[in-house]
Amino acid sequence: MADLSSLKDLAPASEASAPVHVRKVDTLGRSYATGKRKNAVARVWVKAGSGKIIINGRDFTTYFARPVLQMILQQPLVAAARAGQFDIIATVAGGGLSGQAGAVRHGVSKALTYFEPGLRPVLKKGGFLTRDSRVVERKKYGKAKARRSFQFSKR
């Protein structure tokens, strides 16, 4: 067993295990991240620019026609006070439009923290970096849906 004569040699756990977040940027000055929501998976590249957002080769206003989905997409940029400062290119597949918007939002949030690690506390507090793990509950046999039973008749 090791000699524990001096407790001063032991480093506090908080200092030793605190992760240091460094800037992750490729040779083209882009940060890459993946975002997921329901069955949708988004691959997102973020770079400094004029605020263009392109999803699957189309402008985000045409891809996500509903204003609610456009707002969901822009939430991390607004929360970090960086709206209009980054160009975002994303490819997203799987799921429906709502899940895809959530996946792109998750990917944009992660890519922003890689590009600018100082934004991490703001985005973390807003809940943008947490993967929303809620998925559709499976249908069970003997039931009409996941939880709904068939109509019951006493007589």
From Swiss-Prot:
<dbReference type="InterPro" id="IPR020574">
    <property type="entry name" value="Ribosomal_uS9_CS"/>
</dbReference>
<dbReference type="GO" id="GO:0003735">
    <property type="term" value="F:structural constituent of ribosome"/>
</dbReference>
<comment type="similarity">
    <text>Belongs to the universal ribosomal protein uS9 family.</text>
</comment>
<keyword id="KW-0689">Ribosomal protein</keyword>
<dbReference type="InterPro" id="IPR023035">
    <property type="entry name" value="Ribosomal_uS9_bac/plastid"/>
</dbReference>
<dbReference type="GO" id="GO:0003723">
    <property type="term" value="F:RNA binding"/>
</dbReference>
<keyword id="KW-0687">Ribonucleoprotein</keyword>
<dbReference type="GO" id="GO:0022627">
    <property type="term" value="C:cytosolic small ribosomal subunit"/>
</dbReference>
<protein>
    <recommendedName>
        <fullName>Small ribosomal subunit protein uS9</fullName>
    </recommendedName>
</protein>
<dbReference type="GO" id="GO:0006412">
    <property type="term" value="P:translation"/>
</dbReference>
<dbReference type="InterPro" id="IPR020568">
    <property type="entry name" value="Ribosomal_Su5_D2-typ_SF"/>
</dbReference>
<dbReference type="Pfam" id="PF00380">
    <property type="entry name" value="Ribosomal_S9"/>
</dbReference>
<dbReference type="InterPro" id="IPR000754">
    <property type="entry name" value="Ribosomal_uS9"/>
</dbReference>
<dbReference type="InterPro" id="IPR014721">
    <property type="entry name" value="Ribsml_uS5_D2-typ_fold_subgr"/>
</dbReference>
